[in-house]
Amino acid sequence: MGRVGYWTLLVLPALLVWRGPAPSAAAEKGPPALNIAVMLGHSHDVTERELRTLWGPEQAAGLPLDVNVVALLMNRTDPKSLITHVCDLMSGARIHGLVFGDDTDQEAVAQMLDFISSHTFVPILGIHGGASMIMADKDPTSTFFQFGASIQQQATVMLKIMQDYDWHVFSLVTTIFPGYREFISFVKTTVDNSFVGWDMQNVITLDTSFEDAKTQVQLKKIHSSVILLYCSKDEAVLILSEARSLGLTGYDFFWIVPSLVSGNTELIPKEFPSGLISVSYDDWDYSLEARVRDGIGILTTAASSMLEKFSYIPEAKASCYGQMERPEVPMHTLHPFMVNVTWDGKDLSFTEEGYQVHPRLVVIVLNKDREWEKVGKWENHTLSLRHAVWPRYKSFSDCEPDDNHLSIVTLEEAPFVIVEDIDPLTETCVRNTVPCRKFVKINNSTNEGMNVKKCCKGFCIDILKKLSRTVKFTYDLYLVTNGKHGKKVNNVWNGMIGEVVYQRAVMAVGSLTINEERSEVVDFSVPFVETGISVMVSRSNGTVSPSAFLEPFSASVWVMMFVMLLIVSAIAVFVFEYFSPVGYNRNLAKGKAPHGPSFTIGKAIWLLWGLVFNNSVPVQNPKGTTSKIMVSVWAFFAVIFLASYTANLAAFMIQEEFVDQVTGLSDKKFQRPHDYSPPFRFGTVPNGSTERNIRNNYPYMHQYMTKFNQKGVEDALVSLKTGKLDAFIYDAAVLNYKAGRDEGCKLVTIGSGYIFATTGYGIALQKGSPWKRQIDLALLQFVGDGEMEELETLWLTGICHNEKNEVMSSQLDIDNMAGVFYMLAAAMALSLITFIWEHLFYWKLRFCFTGVCSDRPGLLFSISRGIYSCIHGVHIEEKKKSPDFNLTGSQSNMLKLLRSAKNISSMSNMNSSRMDSPKRAADFIQRGSLIMDMVSDKGNLMYSDNRSFQGKESIFGDNMNELQTFVANRQKDNLNNYVFQGQHPLTLNESNPNTVEVAVSTESKANSRPRQLWKKSVDSIRQDSLSQNPVSQRDEATAENRTHSLKSPRYLPEEMAHSDISETSNRATCHREPDNSKNHKTKDNFKRSVASKYPKDCSEVERTYLKTKSSSPRDKIYTIDGEKEPGFHLDPPQFVENVTLPENVDFPDPYQDPSENFRKGDSTLPMNRNPLHNEEGLSNNDQYKLYSKHFTLKDKGSPHSETSERYRQNSTHCRSCLSNMPTYSGHFTMRSPFKCDACLRMGNLYDIDEDQMLQETGNPATGEQVYQQDWAQNNALQLQKNKLRISRQHSYDNIVDKPRELDLSRPSRSISLKDRERLLEGNFYGSLFSVPSSKLSGKKSSLFPQGLEDSKRSKSLLPDHTSDNPFLHSHRDDQRLVIGRCPSDPYKHSLPSQAVNDSYLRSSLRSTASYCSRDSRGHNDVYISEHVMPYAANKNNMYSTPRVLNSCSNRRVYKKMPSIESDV
């Protein structure tokens, strides 16, 4: 009755739980219920209430099941009691699964549970004790799963332990316990298929049912120190007892057993020896409560998966009592859903055999205290062990320890000990390495870690292997945990010394320095390596200075080079070439190479610069012998200079390596590091002999370096390379090795490995160790046999030591060439600044330099005149400044001359028409005032009265309104409005030869090269005057004439400061467009100039003068030409029909002087000039042997001798070389048309039609005869025969005249070269130059019937025949000249005059502003009807050659280019 009551009370809660939900389910359908029973042994410290609370709402959240947990504790776990409890529970409570755990170590429990599951089909989980033991053969129909490892899994861990400790030789002992065959088969298969060098010597299978004698016989076959045992716990007690009797459980034997042998860790048989190693399920980190929870979770997860898939769960088993026959297998069970289960983030899957896929196994060892100790863990197929060297336990008191197996500690430090990973394929150490254990921390806070198998090699490892073979010992090698050599801290030794002192290691082998402090606690062997303290520093690349390309030469050499180049050599070459008889400039001076290039200082510098640096630049080589010698010597200097520079350049362009020089530990950098900026940084590895030495000898140095100490050598090397450390102090042997093996050889030791505090490395042994003497003898033997030297050569010599003398070259990068690029950038910046300054100067500042901003001559003008005076030896007198006009002395002379012209009082020489005018005297007076007004306005006549531009009417009569005005295609600026001497054309007053007038242009002019242009202009004056005179005579000038000839040199014709013949000559002739008051705006359309009587903006004085001028038939003026902006279009000139020559015009004899008022020899004005450079050097007869014919007429009554004498008194000059030539009065009146013999040999760039203007002196003739005979010749030879009209071939197509038949209103058009050639054939130009017969029917021959010789003419590019030349003077032009003199003809023959008393030519100086049109709408002068000849100037007057162009007149002007540079 008591038994029944007991079971009733036991099953009642389950029945209540099972019966409780039924009415609710019937009333309301809910989630299916899942009943899980938990049965545990009574020895566990847990109650049923606690078991039921292990599964709460938190764990059941999200599950589609209503989980009910039934907990049951058992007092007895024998097989009968166990079956009874399980069957009674199934009968009382319908359960779907069972979680079972017991406290026994009997594998029979597992067999019983497997039997129950196979018959009831209830899933059972064995989580602890015998229920989790290995079960070899399970029923295939059972659903029995165990929280444990299979036989194969445990065998794998056992082999892994042996592999880590390099126990490759072992024996296998088993019994006939179920599963032994699987165990043996698996071990053999693993050994045979592994790369590890396993050696399984014996496989012994014992049958414990026989006598112990047979067992001993089998165990005696074991000769290995490692034995694998597979059997039950009871069988293990018997086998180990027999093994102890055979001495197989001593100090050097290792028994490794599975969890089947260890069983319950709380029950340890006494026969188990200390040091027994077992692989067991983790009971330390995997508690029973966690296992129960995971078991319930596995069942609920599997049921949920089945419900989700099949919509139902297996039916609960009501009872296990029934028929003996086997029930039917249900269609679906939980077995397949329990194989792959993941719950609570853990993989709890099972294999088909019912074991966990990832079991939690541990390695336990029976320590000397007879307790199981966890020493390792197997997790995720990885084994981690606690001990680096497996501890040797003294199993029993009767066992003697083996002294030949040593535990050795070492320290990783290349090249003495080098640690590497094991071979991943073989999982062992390769040849020449030994296994070693290295402790690796897992958790730094708790210092938890594991020992990992590594492989060690190096200098000390090779010595250890030699010692092991020589002294005969075995060893286990491990690395010191703290990575230190050994230091006493708080009276506790650490590092390798600590391991030896505290007997955890027998000896310490490595880079361990012998010192006094360590020798007190350990014994050292003899030194095997000499070492000490050394200092390592890093080579810094250094920086290449941007001026590295200049460093091959010192600064003084560069300065001397440029001084020699710019100051000495270049100037010497220039001077030698300038004064050389065959040089450029001397040839130009003598007329040998006109219009050719010149050799300047700039060209000399450019030539020498190109020679120095071998630049292939176009240079101009000198012609003079002296300068060539100088250049040749300079070329030799350049070769030496450049070769020396190139040879030394490479040494300065590379980056110099910088190394800190340290003499020793007592160096100032170590003792006083703060004296350097930045402070010198150095350190060492603490807890070593180096630090101890520094601490004891240099306390301040040790105190400073503590903040720079490094953790290890590798960290120190990185700090050196990265610049965090300047010097590293350490053992010399290690530093020498690191320096020799450093990548890039950037690390060096001072003094090539200089050592301070010399000592050595030794092996540390325990105090009083019996191994010391044997090890000392072995080390000495290695040294004597040379084996130690071989090891040093192998390990301690690096590649950098072998190649330290080799030159290591590298490419030059941008740092090496930075200086050159900086120089280029600076040159570009300087060029840009120069470019901006050049534009700023040209557009803004050059006016001030030319004198516009002040009332003084421009700076450039003064410098140019000064240079000229220095070179040519011309003295420039400094005169006092005018109180009214602040100019130079020569300009003051001009001012006085103008004032004298203003105050003319003598009117006796004026003709009757002028004398009758009441305004004549006031005209002269006010004209002078107008000039003074212009001077007060700084030379700008146009703005003297601040008048705006207005339209002008033509000053011509009605018969001139059809003439078109032309202007050269050129724009001049206001700088040419200056009234500077040498610039303006001067004319003579006809009434008084001593009166001079200047014509000032109203338009501004552009500055050009006055000296060069005048040099070439005057060159043409000296052409043929001397060569055509058959008789050379000396000028018998009076003393007065000689005095005048040496006066002011500023009136030389070369001083036409503002002439620009070269630029005007290359412009096409265009219509002159009228200007208005809108800022000189240029218009594109052509408008015919509107002629008016007088300019509207002229003052009253100007109008009076113009009216007077119009009635004066003999007034002539030379004007300074100015230009306005041209309209760049061509319009053939329009001609007036039926222009006839006035019949009442008499042509006076220009040189007739019946009244003999003046000397007959003084037919020209004497010029104040310097004698030419070759004039003084000629002999009396040779000086004038180049006289030529001249424009002059002899008086009717005068003999030929008088005429010749008069001619001899006048001279001209060569147009090219300025040599003096007589018989020409217009020395400074116009550009000379003559050349000397020397200049005739040189070809001009443009051939000039320079047919002789003067004729051979013939019989005396009257003016009428001269006119009739000279008329046709003058018409045929164009105005250039009178005024040196020089035309360009490439511009003549711009002036094609329109035929007479064309309509005047027809619009203008441009004509190209091709069209010109077509128009010339059969048009107006074919008969353009025909001479009227009426003009050629005169009976009197010309005074000069013979023209220039062919040899004296320039070879022209224009047609040779006058009929082919469209630029020659036409008859129509002469008709126009009869009516009014064209202002474009500044140099003309004077016509014969009826006035007998007016025998000499007299020119009036008048202001151009008083009659010139400021907007160029009409002609500016009223000219008389005359056939012009060149004026014969009186010597008493001074005037300069007139300007080529007059801006107030529209005319055609063609002038010769003076130089090739201006044309190109």
From Swiss-Prot:
Disease the record associates with this protein: Epilepsy, focal, with speech disorder and with or without impaired intellectual development: An autosomal dominant, highly variable neurologic disorder. Features range from severe early-onset seizures associated with delayed psychomotor development, persistent speech difficulties, and intellectual disability to a more benign entity characterized by childhood onset of mild or asymptomatic seizures associated with transient speech difficulties followed by remission of seizures in adolescence and normal psychomotor development. Rare genetic variations in GRIN2A may be associated with susceptibility to schizophrenia, a severe psychiatric disorder characterized by hallucinations, delusions, disorganized speech and behavior, cognitive impairment, and social withdrawal.
Protein name: Glutamate receptor ionotropic, NMDA 2A
Chain sites annotated for binding L-glutamate: S511, T513, R518, S689, T690, D731
Effect of R586K: Unchanged function in ion transmembrane transport; unchanged agonist potency and channel activation by glutamate
Impact when changing G784A: Found in schizophrenia; uncertain significance; unchanged function in ion transmembrane transport; unchanged agonist potency and unchanged channel activation by glutamate
Lineage: Eukaryota, Metazoa, Chordata, Craniata, Vertebrata
Effect of L642M: Found in a patient wit developmental delay and intellectual disability; likely pathogenic; decreased localization to the cell membrane; results in increased agonist potency and channel activation at lower glutamate and glycine concentrations compared to wild type channels
Membrane topology: Multi-pass membrane protein
Entry keyword Transmembrane: yes
Effect ascribed to mutating Q671H: Unchanged function in ion transmembrane transport; unchanged agonist potency and channel activation by glutamate
Record note on what altering E373K does: Found in a cutaneous malignant melanoma sample; somatic mutation
Documented effect of changing G712E: Found in a cutaneous malignant melanoma sample; somatic mutation
Cellular component terms (Gene Ontology): cell surface; cytoplasmic vesicle membrane; dendritic spine; endoplasmic reticulum membrane; glutamatergic synapse; NMDA selective glutamate receptor complex; plasma membrane; postsynaptic density
Ranges in the topological domain labelled Extracellular: 23-556, 647-814
Keywords per UniProt: Calcium, Cell membrane, Cell projection, Chromosomal rearrangement, Cytoplasmic vesicle, Disease variant, Disulfide bond, Epilepsy, Glycoprotein, Ion channel, Ion transport, Ligand-gated ion channel, Magnesium, Membrane, Metal-binding, Phosphoprotein, Postsynaptic cell membrane, Receptor, Signal, Synapse, Transmembrane, Transmembrane helix, Transport, Zinc
Phenotype when changing S809R: In FESD; likely pathogenic; loss of function in ion transmembrane transport; the channel is not activated by glutamate
Organism annotation: Homo sapiens (Human)
Result when mutating P1132L: Found in a cutaneous malignant melanoma sample
Impact when changing G591R: Found in schizophrenia; uncertain significance; unchanged function in ion transmembrane transport; unchanged agonist potency and channel activation by glutamate
Domain note: Contains an N-terminal domain, a ligand-binding domain and a transmembrane domain. Agonist binding to the extracellular ligand-binding domains triggers channel gating.
Impact when changing P57L: Found in a cutaneous malignant melanoma sample; somatic mutation
Consequence of changing L649V: In FESD; likely pathogenic; decreased localization to the cell membrane; results in increased agonist potency and channel activation at lower glutamate and glycine concentrations compared to wild type channels
Result after altering R1285K: Found in a cutaneous malignant melanoma sample; somatic mutation
Consequence recorded when altering N614S: In FESD; likely pathogenic
Non-traversing membrane segments, not crossing the membrane: 601-615
